C-alpha cells in the first residue's frame, strides 16, 4: 500500500536537495569578507535619506484578510458545485454550514465597522 507513495517521497527528497544544496554550497564555499561599505544601506547609488518603510493603515490589512477569506470560499465552492450531484444531502448540508459560518463572520465584521473607511 505504501509503495504507491514512494515516487512522491522520492520527488520530495529530490526537490529538497535541489532547493537546499545550492544554498548550503553558496554559504559554505563563498568568500566571507564583510566591510563597512558592503554592510551600509544602499538606495539607487545614494545613502538612504530616510527610512524607506511607509506606514500603512491597518484597514488595508483587514481588507486583504477578508479578500483571502472570500477567495478561499470561492476555491471551496467551485469544486463543490462540480460534484454537487454526486455528494448528496450530506455534502449539501456541509457546504451550507460552511457558508453560514462565513456569513456570520461577515456580518460580525460589518457590525464592528471594520468595512467602513471614515
From Swiss-Prot:
TM region positions: 6-26, 64-84, 87-107
RNA-binding as UniProt keyword: no
Superkingdom of the organism of origin: Bacteria
Enzyme class: translocase
Signal peptide coordinates: none
This enzyme's EC code(s): 7.1.1.-
GO molecular function, one term: quinone binding
Record's subcellular location: Cell inner membrane
Catalytically driven reaction(s): a quinone + NADH + 5 H(+)(in) = a quinol + NAD(+) + 4 H(+)(out)
GO CC annotations on file: NADH dehydrogenase complex; plasma membrane
Topological category with respect to the lipid bilayer: Multi-pass membrane protein
InterPro entries: NAD(P)H_OxRDtase_bac/plastid (IPR023043), NADH_UbQ/plastoQ_OxRdtase_su3 (IPR000440), NDAH_ubi_oxred_su3_sf (IPR038430)
The keyword Translocase is assigned to this record: yes
A Pfam family annotated for this UniProt entry: Oxidored_q4
Primary localization: membrane
UniProt KW keywords: Cell inner membrane, Cell membrane, Membrane, NAD, Quinone, Translocase, Transmembrane, Transmembrane helix, Transport, Ubiquinone
SUBUNIT field: NDH-1 is composed of 14 different subunits. Subunits NuoA, H, J, K, L, M, N constitute the membrane sector of the complex.
PANTHER family named among the record's database cross-references: NADH-UBIQUINONE OXIDOREDUCTASE CHAIN 3 (PTHR11058:SF9)
Function: NDH-1 shuttles electrons from NADH, via FMN and iron-sulfur (Fe-S) centers, to quinones in the respiratory chain. The immediate electron acceptor for the enzyme in this species is believed to be ubiquinone. Couples the redox reaction to proton translocation (for every two electrons transferred, four hydrogen ions are translocated across the cytoplasmic membrane), and thus conserves the redox energy in a proton gradient.
Family as reported in the entry's similarity comment: Belongs to the complex I subunit 3 family.
Protein name as it appears in the record: NADH-quinone oxidoreductase subunit A
Organism per entry: Acidithiobacillus ferrooxidans (strain ATCC 53993 / BNL-5-31)
Upper taxonomic lineage: Bacteria, Pseudomonadati, Pseudomonadota, Acidithiobacillia, Acidithiobacillales
